[in-house]
């Protein structure tokens, strides 16, 4: 005879027992106390031991019987019963987590751990019982729906693994007895609160181990924080290095762009000089239909001839302006008390070959045109004519090679020919000194009047022209050459100064940027006062931060020339104020 492992019913054969077991599997598990259903067997056992604690209080080990009711809708009210052995010690450990029977409850984490342990212990008890039945010949057949793979139980407190549940029970009761105890009402058992998480312990040593775990966790977290902090510092350092690299790269790029811009501005970008610029412009005029090809070839031939002989072709020159100014001030001007004019000087304006960079060269041509017409300078300038711009560049290079102004030569790479490099007061001084012309540079390095004006500049030029005469007539034609006037970005030539009846001063200036057609208006017999507007510059019209002038004062002896060449090794200018 065979019996059912679940309800104990006796059957006659093995097939009948299997059919009987299938009926059990199809039935629904129902709580015998509250009719709860819809859960599995382990969950039902846990439900009974927790929700119906008073009805199932354990008496002793392996003597608690939990009656579980199975009901099948097809079989009506048929009731089957099975017994489940539960270790009372494990049950006590689980039950101690509920406040119904205890004045003090353990923490939530410990409660869940013991509940899990209880459920596992119940399952292990059933496995142990089945193992014993199997050894006695009452085990179920191979292929039974209840056959499961056995796994050794593990201690939930220390992780120790035992072969059988009974051994695990003994281990838990002997090694972890204090963890299974729970404080009861009316018991004066001492309690210890964890200062970190509030967990209540009944044993001081357990509390100490628990706190040590907190400290180890805290130490680990601090170590992780240090690692994270170190990583953050390394990342910040890398970001800083990347930012510094980008900043330096951007600064280097800006420096290159600024340097290239300055090179273009000062004609040092290897784009050719006067000849190349003139040819490009004439070719462009032919392309636009503004110049006939025959005219192009004619102008090109004239330009090449002028460069070859080194003499300006005179196509940008206007002569006779000083004489016209003398007539105007003598006969027409009524608001001027006195005017001082330089020696005769020709006006030269910029051409297409030097447009944008040739003002310094054109002003030198004006100054030299005046010196060539002055007998005082005929000896040192004997046989000279007004040179073209490429010839002026060659003359300055010769002065550098002779030893004049080495610093200025270095700044321009010792080369002017074939470039569009600007020249200023220092180059004019160097060239005149090399020609034995005595001159001086005066630097008006800051304003000396209100609103950034330079009244001291006007006073100096007045003294320069009026020093030869006293009680002079209204118009004075002096023997003084014109004055080279330089400021940031441009240069002009001062050919005289007028003093009005209200004692204000106005400079008379030739600008190389003014074309010939405008200058020729000054040659008319009936010249009007409005025509002088382009020449007159009063104090309020000159407001640049700094001005430099080059004034010619005579001829140098060979000794003076050598001394000035030596002095130009460290170039200095006279400063006013």
UniProtKB/Swiss-Prot annotation:
EC top class, as a word: hydrolase
Name which cysteines form disulfide bonds: none
State the residue spans of region: zUBD/ZHA: 248-273
Q: Which residues form the active site?
A: 359, 490, 511
Q: Where in the cell is it found?
A: Cytoplasm; Nucleus
- Site described as Involved in the stabilization of negative charge on the oxyanion by the formation of the oxyanion hole, located at 486
* Catalytic activity annotation: Thiol-dependent hydrolysis of ester, thioester, amide, peptide and isopeptide bonds formed by the C-terminal Gly of ubiquitin (a 76-residue protein attached to proteins as an intracellular targeting signal)
Enumerate the residue ranges forming zinc fingers (C2H2-type).
Answer: 2-24, 29-52, 153-176, 192-214
List its EC numbers. Answer: 3.4.19.12
Outline the segment boundaries, as ranges, of region: Disordered: 231-262
An annotated GO cellular component of this protein is: nucleus
Indicate where this protein is primarily found. Answer: cytoplasm
What SUPFAM superfamilies does the annotation carry? Answer: Cysteine proteinases
A Pfam family (short name) is: Peptidase_C78
Keywords assigned: Acetylation, Cytoplasm, Hydrolase, Metal-binding, Nucleus, Repeat, Zinc, Zinc-finger
InterPro entries, alphabetically? Papain-like_cys_pep_sf, UfSP1/2_DUB_cat, Zinc_finger/UBP_domain, Znf_C2H2_type
Q: Which domain of life is it from?
A: Eukaryota
Report if keyword DNA-binding is assigned: no
Q: Which family does it belong to?
A: Belongs to the peptidase C78 family. ZUFSP subfamily.
Summary of the function given for this chain in its UniProt record = Deubiquitinase with endodeubiquitinase activity that specifically interacts with and cleaves 'Lys-63'-linked long polyubiquitin chains. Shows only weak activity against 'Lys-11' and 'Lys-48'-linked chains. Plays an important role in genome stability pathways, functioning to prevent spontaneous DNA damage and also promote cellular survival in response to exogenous DNA damage. Modulates the ubiquitination status of replication protein A (RPA) complex proteins in response to replication stress.
Query: Domain description from the entry?
Result: The motif interacting with ubiquitin (MIU) and ZUFSP ubiquitin-binding domain (zUBD, also called ZUFSP helical arm ZHA) are responsible for binding the distal (outgoing) ubiquitin units S1 and S2 respectively.
PANTHER family membership? ZINC FINGER PROTEIN (PTHR24403), ZINC FINGER-CONTAINING UBIQUITIN PEPTIDASE 1 (PTHR24403:SF82)
What binding partners and quaternary form does the record give?
Interacts with RPA1 and RPA2.
According to UniProt, the name of this protein is Zinc finger-containing ubiquitin peptidase 1
Species name for this entry? Rattus norvegicus
Q: What is the lineage of its organism?
A: Eukaryota, Metazoa, Chordata, Craniata, Vertebrata
């Amino acid at each position: 005879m065979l019996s059912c492992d679940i309800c104990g019913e006796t059957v006659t054969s093995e097939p009948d027992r299997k059919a009987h077991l299938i009926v059990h599997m199809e039935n629904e598990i129902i709580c015998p106390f509250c009719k709860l259903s819809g859960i599995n067997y382990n969950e039902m056992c846990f439900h009974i031991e927790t929700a119906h604690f008073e009805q199932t209080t354990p008496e002793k080990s392996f003597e608690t019987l939990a009656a579980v009711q199975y009901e099948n809708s097809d079989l009506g009210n048929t009731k089957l019963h099975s017994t489940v052995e539960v270790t009372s010690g494990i049950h006590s450990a689980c039950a101690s987590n509920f406040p119904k029977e205890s004045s003090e409850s353990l923490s939530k984490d410990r409660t869940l751990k013991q509940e899990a342990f209880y459920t596992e212990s119940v399952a292990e008890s059933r496995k142990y019982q089945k193992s014993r039945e199997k050894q006695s010949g009452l085990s179920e057949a191979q292929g039974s729906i209840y056959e499961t793979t056995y796994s050794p139980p593990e201690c939930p407190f220390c992780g120790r693994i035992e072969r059988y549940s009974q051994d695990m029970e003994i281990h838990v009761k002997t090694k972890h007895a204090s963890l299974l105890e729970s404080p009861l009402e009316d018991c004066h058992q001492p309690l210890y609160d964890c200062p970190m998480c509030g967990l209540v312990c009944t044993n001081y040593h357990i509390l100490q181990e628990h706190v040590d775990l907190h400290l180890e966790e805290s130490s680990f977290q601090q170590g992780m924080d240090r690692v994270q902090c170190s990583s953050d510092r390394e990342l910040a350092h890398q970001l800083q290095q990347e930012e510094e690299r980008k900043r330096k790269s951007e600064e280097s790029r800006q420096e290159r762009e600024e340097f290239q811009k300055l090179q273009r501005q000062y004609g040092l970008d290897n784009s050719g000089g006067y000849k190349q610029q003139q040819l490009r412009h004439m070719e462009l005029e032919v392309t636009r239909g503004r110049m006939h090809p025959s005219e192009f070839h004619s102008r090109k031939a004239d330009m090449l001839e002028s460069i070859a002989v080194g003499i300006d072709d005179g196509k940008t020159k206007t002569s006779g302006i000083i004489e016209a100014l003398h007539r105007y001030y003598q006969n027409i001007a009524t608001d001027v008390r006195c005017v001082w004019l330089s020696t005769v000087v020709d006006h030269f304006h910029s051409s297409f070959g030097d447009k944008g960079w040739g003002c310094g060269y054109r002003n030198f041509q004006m100054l030299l045109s005046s010196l060539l017409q002055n007998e005082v300078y005929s000896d040192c300038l004997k046989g000279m004519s007004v040179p073209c711009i490429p010839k002026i560049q060659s003359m300055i290079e010769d002065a550098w090679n002779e030893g004049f102004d080495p610093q200025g030569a270095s700044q321009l790479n010792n080369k002017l020919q074939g470039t569009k490099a600007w020249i200023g007061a220092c180059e004019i001084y160097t060239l005149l000194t090399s020609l034995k012309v005595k001159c001086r540079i005066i630097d008006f390095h800051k304003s000396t009047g209100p609103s950034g004006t330079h009244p001291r500049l006007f006073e100096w030029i007045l003294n320069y022209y009026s020093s030869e005469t006293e009680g002079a007539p209204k118009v004075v034609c002096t023997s003084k050459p014109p004055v080279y006037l330089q400021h940031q970005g441009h240069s002009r030539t001062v050919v005289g100064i007028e003093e009005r009846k209200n004692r204000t001063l106005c400079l008379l200036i030739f600008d190389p940027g003014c074309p010939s057609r405008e200058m020729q208006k000054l040659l008319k017999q009936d010249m009007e006062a409005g025509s002088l507007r382009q020449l007159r510059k009063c104090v309020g019209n000159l407001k640049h931060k700094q001005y430099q002038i080059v004034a010619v004062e005579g001829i140098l002896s060979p000794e003076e020339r050598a001394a000035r060449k030596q002095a130009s090794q460290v170039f200095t200018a006279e400063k006013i104020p």
